[in-house]
């Protein structure tokens, strides 16, 4: 066994390139902070020539998957309450491919989500919106996504869901913007008062 990494901080989720010559992995240098973005690293399979390929990308990277030719990786990230699927080339260029990656549980759909990539680059992923639980969507040739299932039609024909609104607040401490979500009750009437939970 040979140790390939030694930075002060975690290194994890290693993925070997299709030709076996490179290793992509996630990690970060531990600066003893509450949160630090997961960074995408690349090195030779010998452990040499370690580089950061996501250096200019200001979001935490998860779920890395090599493309079939070894020219880049697919991954997921969260941005402003929305989980996304993206592609990063080995020179660090990021291309967003899909929004609304979501989980398969009704109670907490934002907590997960998954995708799969075929050798030809076709992507299938769990697509979720506040107004419906997850469905499957497909992306071909890195173009726009298309829903391919309607699994929740029966459920939604018998339920009325509350409308979800994105709201932003300004911090009184440092002026930063803070994102929030307001879900109004089903059959909401603006002339009535409702408890805030």
PLM segments and residue spans:
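Long hydrophobic segments that form regular secondary structure
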Residues: 70-72, 92
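Short loop/turn segments that connect beta-strands within beta-propeller blades
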Residues: 44-48, 89-93, 140-143
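A flexible loop/linker signature enriched in serine peptidases of the S9 family
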Residues: 3-12, 26-41, 52-62, 76-86, ...
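Hydrophobic beta-strand anchors of alpha/beta hydrolase catalytic cores
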Residues: 195-197
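Residue-level detector of Asp-centered blade-edge/turn motifs that repeat once per structural unit
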Residues: 18-19, 68-69, 117-120
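Non-catalytic accessory segments flanking enzyme active sites
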Residues: 1, 76, 96-192
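Hydrophobic beta-strand positions that form the internal "hydrophobic ladder"
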Residues: 20-24, 72-73, 123-124
């Amino acid at each position: 066994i040979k140790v390939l990494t030694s930075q002060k901080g975690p290194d994890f989720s290693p993925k070997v390139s299709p030709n076996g010559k490179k290793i992509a992995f996630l990690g970060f240098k531990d600066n003893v902070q509450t949160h630090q973005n997961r960074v995408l690293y690349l090195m030779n399979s010998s452990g040499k020539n370690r580089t950061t390929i996501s250096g200019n990308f200001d979001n935490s990277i998860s779920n890395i998957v090599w493309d079939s030719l070894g020219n880049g990786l697919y991954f997921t990230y969260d941005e402003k309450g929305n989980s996304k699927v993206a592609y990063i080339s080995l020179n660090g260029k990021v291309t967003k491919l899909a929004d609304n990656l979501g989980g398969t549980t009704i109670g907490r759909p934002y907590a997960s989500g998954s995708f799969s990539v075929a050798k030809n680059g076709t992507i299938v992923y769990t697509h979720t919106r506040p107004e419906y639980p997850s469905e499957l969507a497909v992306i071909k040739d890195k173009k726009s996504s298309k829903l391919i299932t309607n699994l929740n039609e029966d459920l939604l024909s018998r339920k009325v869901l509350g409308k979800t609104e994105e709201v932003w607040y300004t911090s009184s401490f440092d002026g930063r913007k803070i994102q929030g979500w307001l879900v109004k009750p089903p059959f909401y009437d603006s002339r009535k008062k409702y408890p805030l939970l």
